[in-house]
Amino acid sequence: MSKTAITSYPKERINILFLENISDKAVQQFKQNGYTNVRRLGGALSEEELIREIGNVHLLGIRSKTHIPARVLAAATKLQAIGCFCIGVNQVDLKAATRSGVVVFNAPYSNTRSVAELVIGAAIMLIRRIPDKNKAAHEGVWLKDAKGSFELRGKTLGIIGYGNIGSQVSVLAEALGMKV
């Protein structure tokens, strides 16, 4: 016999607001877990719009474009937590959030691999002169020679900053035969 966990506040009374195109999967996940008052808006809201919208919100999900200053937090009388679905939390006034008792969390590894792949992709694009060749091809000129085109293999890559992203760039670069 399984028992349903008793919460201190009924899930169906908790209001959740997601901004900036937070994934539909997140909305579905919350709804599947009994949270019925979940709204998702496509973009970031201005400070004035946030003040109008946030009064009955218990959980706010944002990305990097939405800014939550003290004035917005003062209007957020029911807010319990802000989920920043991005690397940092610098868009939230953390001191004001702490004074208001609002928990702020982020997703520090959410795009680490994506950024590392873009770095490697940009390196390939530049070393192979893809922008020049693409421009020429669109002008009807096919540059068939390989002069000035190189491979990443054997090249040396210097990484400034060896945090989450830098270490992932290193893994990908080494897999391509680069010296890091």
Residue ranges and their predicted role:
Residues 1-57:
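N-terminal glycine-/charge-rich "phosphate-binding" loop or analogous flexible N-terminal tail
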Residues 9, 145-180:
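Rossmann-like dinucleotide/phosphate-binding beta-alpha-beta segment
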Residues 15-17, 61, 83, 158:
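Short, well-ordered beta-strand segments
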Residues 21-23, 42-45, 64-67, 87-89, ...:
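Short beta->alpha connector loops
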Residues 28, 51-52, 70, 74, ...:
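Alpha-helical segments flanking ligand/cofactor-binding loops in enzyme cores
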Residues 29, 118, 122, 168, ...:
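Rossmann-fold NAD(P)-dependent oxidoreductase module
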Residues 32, 55, 97-99, 175:
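Residues at the C-terminal ends
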Residues 39, 57-136, 146-153:
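Phosphate/diphosphate ligand-binding glycine-rich loop within oxidoreductases
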